[in-house]
C-alpha cells in the first residue's frame, strides 16, 4: 500500500513535465511539417516554372497550395492542439482581422515573399516559421511572448 502511494505521488509530480514535453515535441514537429510544405511550394514554382499560390487560413489551421497547372492542389492541416497565432508580415495599417485568410504568390525565378507564420501550442510555446526572401529557404525560430 505504501509503495502504491509513493508511485501515485511520483506520477502526479512527473505528469506535468511529461505533458509539457510532448506538447513541445508536437509543436516542433508541426513547425517542421510547415517548413517542408512551404519548401515544396517554392520548389514547385522553381522546378516547374509556374506561379504558385499559398493560402493560409488561421481559423481552420490549414495551408493550401494551388498552381497554374491543371488539377494541382496540396493541403496541409495543423493538429488540433497547434494554432496559427499570426501571419506575417502584418497587413498595412494593422487594422485587419488577424484571423482572415491570407494569400501569397510565389513566382518562378522571382523573389520569394517574406512569409511568416507564428505557431503556438497549448503550453504557450511558439515557433515562427519564416521564409527568407533572399535564399527562399524556410527556417524556424523559437519564440516566447508577443509578435515582433
List each model region and its residues.
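N-terminal signal-anchor/signal peptide hydrophobic helix marking the start
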Residues: 1-5
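N-terminal helix-rich module
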Residues: 9, 13-36, 43, 47, ...
Amino acid at each position: 500500500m505504501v509503495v502504491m502511494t509513493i508511485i501515485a505521488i511520483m506520477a502526479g509530480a512527473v505528469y506535468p513535465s511529461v505533458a509539457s514535453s510532448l506538447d513541445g515535441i508536437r509543436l516542433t514537429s508541426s513547425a517542421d511539417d510547415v517548413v517542408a510544405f512551404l519548401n515544396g511550394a517554392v520548389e514547385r514554382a522553381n522546378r516547374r516554372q509556374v506561379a504558385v499560390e499559398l493560402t493560409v487560413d488561421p481559423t481552420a489551421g490549414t495551408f493550401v497550395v494551388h498552381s497554374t497547372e491543371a488539377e494541382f492542389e496540396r493541403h496541409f492541416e495543423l493538429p488540433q492542439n497547434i494554432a496559427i497565432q499570426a501571419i506575417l508580415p502584418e497587413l498595412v495599417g494593422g487594422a485587419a482581422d488577424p484571423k482572415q485568410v491570407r494569400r501569397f504568390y510565389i513566382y518562378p525565378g522571382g523573389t520569394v515573399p517574406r512569409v511568416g507564420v507564428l505557431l503556438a501550442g497549448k503550453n504557450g510555446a511558439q515557433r515562427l516559421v519564416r521564409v527568407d526572401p533572399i535564399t527562399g529557404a524556410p527556417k524556424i525560430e523559437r519564440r516566447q511572448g508577443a509578435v515582433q
